[in-house]
Amino acid sequence: MKIRPLHDRVIVKRKEVESKSAGGIMLTGSAAGKSTRGEVLAVGRGRSLDNGEIKALDVKVGDTIIFNDGYGVKVEKIDNEEVLIMSESDILAIVEK
């Protein structure tokens, strides 16, 4: 199934969290925690400004991002894969390679 976000929404696939501590101990369950990094899968057209223009998003498909995993981030299952739907304002940073 193809999904296209509207307005300033972004579809993100959460990246797996490192399951090993700095000391080499394997972490499981809640000790590993949830990652707040993800890969952008799709972006909307942009945010509508008061003058009617559309401001394009700063993120693009393929970007690795750091996001705020809180209120406003919706979790959905698309083709048996969990994805996150969020506004661009929930994105804190783009990880540059």
Swiss-Prot record:
Disulfide bonds: none annotated. GO terms for molecular function: ATP binding; metal ion binding; protein folding chaperone; protein-folding chaperone binding; unfolded protein binding. SUPFAM superfamilies: GroES-like. GO terms for biological process: chaperone cofactor-dependent protein refolding. It comes from the Bacteria. It is found in: Cytoplasm. SMART domains: Cpn10. One of its GO terms (cellular component) is cytoplasm. Keywords: Chaperone, Cytoplasm. HAMAP family: CH10 (MF_00580). Heptamer of 7 subunits arranged in a ring. Interacts with the chaperonin GroEL. Together with the chaperonin GroEL, plays an essential role in assisting protein folding. The GroEL-GroES system forms a nano-cage that allows encapsulation of the non-native substrate proteins and provides a physical environment optimized to promote and accelerate protein folding. GroES binds to the apical surface of the GroEL ring, thereby capping the opening of the GroEL channel. Belongs to the GroES chaperonin family. This is Co-chaperonin GroES. It comes from Baumannia cicadellinicola subsp. Homalodisca coagulata. The lineage of its organism: Bacteria, Pseudomonadati, Pseudomonadota, Gammaproteobacteria, Candidatus Palibaumannia. The gene is groES.
